[in-house]
């Protein structure tokens, strides 16, 4: 298939696109490249691409495309809190418009990168795909709104699928340090402290970005009737941890590290555990391969290789919200998160 991947130059996209190509699919990317300066230790995969904001996508951008994988958007809760109205404009309105255009273009598969943040504040209960939504951030709410507005577009010719990713971790050419396991390992290596900004009690499901990418591939290649207008939790049911448990794993992986709690550490209102059994039952080709300990070991080795420093991961290069603020303050982005110079299309 010829697959259009929005957000292909982001944290997940730069891992997903080579996987798709290795499986024999033709890939074209679409990305505004807000994080083009955030490359970590390796080159971003070179694929034909369109440099464009998802708010500006037109029908002709889908020419020759068989399937869409939609990853683009403001990528996490702190970014969503930066400007909630803008979050809904980009993450919700532009996503629904993208799906509507894809359907009009005759595309049969639309795979949406949703999130377990849709469950929000849910306590200790184990949640499957039928659980009630309870998002607590604009980011989580925007994901719910997209799922609810794209589902009615489904018909005999258009099959949307929502993949509700657990909290991601792992090494990527566009690495993020604002994710819990990535962040804890970075603190442990650079300072000897596993720095806890919450009290460690909330539950969080986690999943490696390679396993997220495998889920996208499995959904793409599955018989249509298995994924038509369906939602799947993406991860492993065994990979639900309290944040304090993740800190203990990092402590065991990173020598001479110790766990420290911030003076103002309190409970994080985001707390949820998810049941991920459905996706492996329905899509047997999806076989997740990572767990938290192996992921922490991978991150530790990658950080050692580049001699990571605190100023690297706490500064604007890799911290998504600070990077956006830096681009705005330097005049490169306007307050609507559009490049001040005209976007260009390349390579297609």
Regions found by a protein language model. Give the residues of each.
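N-terminal Rossmann/SDR dinucleotide-binding element
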Residues: 1-67
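C-terminal substrate-binding subdomain of Rossmann-fold SDR/epimerase-dehydratase oxidoreductases
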Residues: 192, 197-348
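NAD(P)H-binding glycine-rich loop region in Rossmannoid oxidoreductase-like domains
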Residues: 54-90
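SDR active-site strand-loop-helix element
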Residues: 6, 30, 68-71, 110-116, ...
């Amino acid at each position: 298939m010829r697959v259009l991947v929005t957000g292909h130059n982001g944290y997940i996209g730069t891992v997903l696109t080579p996987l798709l190509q290795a499986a024999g699919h033709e890939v074209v990317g679409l990305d505004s490249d807000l994080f083009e300066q955030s490359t970590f230790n390796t080159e971003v995969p070179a694929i034909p691409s369109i440099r464009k904001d998802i708010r500006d996508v037109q029908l002709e951008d889908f020419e020759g495309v068989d399937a869409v994988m939609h990853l683009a958007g403001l990528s996490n809760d702190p970014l969503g809190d930066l400007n909630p109205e803008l979050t809904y404009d980009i993450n919700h309105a532009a996503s629904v418009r993208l799906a509507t255009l894809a359907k009009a273009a005759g595309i049969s598969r639309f795979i949406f990168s949703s999130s377990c943040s849709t469950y929000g504040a849910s306590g200790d209960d184990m949640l499957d795909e039928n659980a009630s939504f309870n998002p607590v951030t604009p980011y989580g709410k925007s994901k719910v709104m997209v799922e609810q507005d794209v589902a009615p577009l489904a018909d005999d010719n258009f099959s949307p699928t929502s993949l509700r990713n657990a909290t991601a971790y792992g090494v990527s050419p566009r690495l993020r340090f604002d994710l819990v396991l990535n962040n804890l390992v970075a603190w442990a290596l650079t300072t000897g402290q596993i720095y806890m900004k919450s009290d460690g009690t909330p539950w969080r499901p986690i999943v490696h970005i390679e396993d997220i990418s495998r889920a996208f591939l499995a959904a793409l290649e599955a018989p249509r009737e298995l994924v038509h207008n369906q939602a799947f939790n993406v991860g492993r049911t065994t990979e639900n941890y309290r944040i304090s448990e993740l800190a203990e794993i990092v402590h065991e992986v990173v020598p001479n590290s110790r766990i420290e709690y911030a003076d103002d550490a309190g409970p994080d209102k985001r707390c949820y555990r998810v049941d991920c059994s459905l996706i492996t039952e329905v899509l047997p080709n999806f076989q997740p391969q990572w767990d938290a300990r192996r992921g922490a070991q991978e991150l530790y080795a990658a950080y050692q290789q580049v001699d990571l420093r605190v100023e690297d991961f706490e500064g604007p290069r890799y911290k998504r919200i600070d990077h956006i603020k830096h681009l705005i303050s330097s005049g490169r982005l306007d307050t609507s998160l559009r490049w001040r110079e005209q976007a260009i299309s390349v390579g297609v």
